[in-house]
């Protein structure tokens, strides 16, 4: 009887230890997810900024990488990539460098096509069309004979102008990844088609699928904050060997260069 009692106590303690250890692991995962969200909030709090000229007066994260007197440059990028079944992969998007020192903004609209050659090796064909921004409007800086393309450029809106992440804290059950050696980190969430950001993307782009996307928050660099490294958003609607549909976006605050574009 005494032996059975000892065995029962031992088993109970073992179960309790496993339970506590499991809770510790869960808490550790939750803690890392919270830390990643807090890190991304430093970038996502600029969403939405409807008037791009507001970036001239927005201060970003600064560290020793910035020269004294350098007000910094915002780099914003939005790009939609599609690869229908049996067709080539095409990306269309824009990059804009908003220099707070000179209060000027320039960049380029890009069209990137990737297809396989006869040997199955990918061939990339990228075209860039230089642009500038004045009074919150985008203008090509060189003549464009294609009126449809010219209109697409002039009507382009960056995701930061209409995206909104005030409910980021409500995103739950993310797939968390963290590698302190790189360092790199990410959090991925399954969204639904009622999500406001998903609705906004569908409103502006022809997205030929009813599948709700996954949102990936992906970054590298010091998780506690650094101007070195990058942070990216990716909405993946379809991803397989035959078909791909995804939207990528990034907003970075960096030391200014003499000629960013």
UniProtKB/Swiss-Prot annotation:
N-palmitoyl cysteine lipid sites: 23
Signal is among the record's keywords: yes
InterPro entries associated with the record: Csa, Csa_sf
Membrane topology category: Lipid-anchor
Annotated compartments: Cell membrane
Signal peptide segment: 1-22
A cellular component term, taken from the record's GO annotations: plasma membrane
Domain of life: Bacteria
Pfam families for the chain: DUF576
Keywords: Cell membrane, Lipoprotein, Membrane, Palmitate, Signal
Lipidation (S-diacylglycerol cysteine): 23
Family assignment from sequence similarity: Belongs to the staphylococcal tandem lipoprotein family.
Listed name of the protein: Uncharacterized lipoprotein SERP2422
Species name: Staphylococcus epidermidis (strain ATCC 35984 / DSM 28319 / BCRC 17069 / CCUG 31568 / BM 3577 / RP62A)
